UniProtKB/Swiss-Prot annotation:
InterPro entries: Ribosomal_protein_uL29, Ribosomal_uL29, Ribosomal_uL29_CS, Ribosomal_uL29_sf. This is Large ribosomal subunit protein uL29. NCBIfam families: L29. Belongs to the universal ribosomal protein uL29 family. One of its GO terms (cellular component) is cytosolic large ribosomal subunit. Keywords: Ribonucleoprotein, Ribosomal protein. It comes from Chelativorans sp. (strain BNC1).
Length: 66
């Protein structure tokens, strides 16, 4: 997911996407623990997408306060 795509989302959409990514991260963690994880790079990608969404959400909330 690109930062430009994330910036185009509303705060509600960001919250929904963040919840979906956290669920996927949870599932990937269990797959890794049981040895069923095939796409190991997906863990890193999900982690960075979560960070990207949190960063942009914080920027948007800081922009509203200023």
């Amino acid at each position: 997911m690109k930062a430009a795509d994330v910036r185009a989302m509303t705060t509600d959409q960001l919250d929904d996407e963040l919840a979906n990514l956290k669920k996927e991260q949870f599932n990937l963690r269990f797959q890794k623990a049981t040895g069923q994880l095939e796409k190991t790079a997906r863990v890193k990608q999900i982690r960075r997408d979560i960070a990207r969404i949190k960063t942009i959400a914080a920027e948007k909330s800081a922009g509203k306060k200023a």
